[in-house]
Amino acid sequence: MDNVIGLEIIEVVEQAAIASARWMGKGDKNMADQAAVDAMRNRMNQIHMRGRIVIGEGERDEAPMLYIGEEVGICTRPDAAQYCNPEELIEIDIAVDPCEGTNLCAYGQPGSMAVLAISEKGGLFAAPDFYMKKLAAPPAAKGKVDIRNSATENLKILSECLDRAIDELVVVVMKRDRHNDLIQEIRDAGARVQLISDGDVSAALACAFSGTNIHALMGIGAAPEGVISAAAMRALGGHFQGQLVYDPAVVMTKEWANRTREGNLEELKKAGITDPDKVYEAEELASGETVLFAACGITPGMLMKGVRFFKGGARTQSLVISTQSKTARFVDTIHMFDQQLKSLQLY
């Protein structure tokens, strides 16, 4: 699968990022998202595969979607027999977030990117549109820190694993009211906090690379993005755990103002989740034999530059990670829109 569609999924996120970047700074997050969705769907439908969206985006925000259950790829067309050999058919599950950090893109802030993860059919956890408590950490701390520990205890373990003083550690936390106690605990333990408004996939990724000055991600975010983060962290050998959150009193968000703990538990039960308190490891959220992750910066971020337009073209920076080839490739691409382009932007 890696050799067949690895390059093509890079183009999927590149096209989504370019389309969304045209709306960067214009204050309309829905248009930034819609442009990314349309571009991502269009490019995926040009790939020789039978793909199924298992993690879509937008339900909670009432935004445009690549909806859960949607089929994409040339081999899903009514005339697929003309193009696809059933014996060579690639069936894959796909998790997408065409514009992760829509507000970041809309207001020209760093950290927005187009992301997706793929695996063979059944290889990605079909997370419900709930919230998830998350813990991400570098490979050196894999299996040593634990989401069931207090933040203070995990910071002590992380300090030992990384051979750093606690006051040299930086923890990323989303700026939400529900995290006030967590933020205070991290600070009281002596570590530093980097607050972000959106985009915790990027923060989870940053934990796996030395030199980013990000050593952990803690807190509650969206469950679908948790699966995407887990796919990347599994491929990178980093630590990732997730635990679904179903209590509106814990989430503290207006989107769940009319929901109840009991109603959420019933919804999870209907979704086939019999243990709502289960702690999921990265290998359970992205369990496939082969897992691919791809991202392309829309605005400048921790790991990738954003889309840069120039006369007649654009330049993108992407990242593709594979469990099959055990690689993390940074891809710098010049896109030539104008056939009469007189020069290319080198940097």
UniProtKB/Swiss-Prot annotation:
GO terms for molecular function: fructose 1,6-bisphosphate 1-phosphatase activity; metal ion binding; sedoheptulose-bisphosphatase activity. It catalyses: beta-D-fructose 1,6-bisphosphate + H2O = beta-D-fructose 6-phosphate + phosphate; D-sedoheptulose 1,7-bisphosphate + H2O = D-sedoheptulose 7-phosphate + phosphate. Its EC number is 3.1.3.11, 3.1.3.37. InterPro entries: FBPase_class-2/SBPase (IPR004464). Gene3D superfamilies: 3.40.190.90, Fructose-1,6-Bisphosphatase, subunit A, domain 1. It holds the Pfam family FBPase_glpX. Keywords: Calvin cycle, Carbohydrate metabolism, Hydrolase, Manganese, Metal-binding. GO terms for biological process: fructose 1,6-bisphosphate metabolic process; gluconeogenesis; glycerol metabolic process; reductive pentose-phosphate cycle. Mn(2+) 2 binds at D97, E100, E225. Its cofactor is Mn(2+). It is an enzyme of class 3 (hydrolase). Mn(2+) 1 binds at D33, E57. Disulfide bonds: none annotated. One of its GO terms (cellular component) is cytosol. Pathway: Carbohydrate biosynthesis; Calvin cycle. The keyword NADP does not apply. It comes from the Bacteria. The keyword Manganese applies. Substrate binds at E100, G101, T102, Y131, R176, D177, R178, D198, G199, D200. NCBIfam families: glpX. PANTHER family: FRUCTOSE-1,6-BISPHOSPHATASE 1 CLASS 2-RELATED, FRUCTOSE-1,6-BISPHOSPHATASE CLASS 2. Catalyzes the hydrolysis of fructose 1,6-bisphosphate (Fru 1,6-P2) and sedoheptulose 1,7-bisphosphate (Sed 1,7-P2) to fructose 6-phosphate and sedoheptulose 7-phosphate, respectively. Belongs to the FBPase class 2 family. Homotetramer. This is D-fructose 1,6-bisphosphatase class 2/sedoheptulose 1,7-bisphosphatase. It comes from Thermosynechococcus vestitus (strain NIES-2133 / IAM M-273 / BP-1).
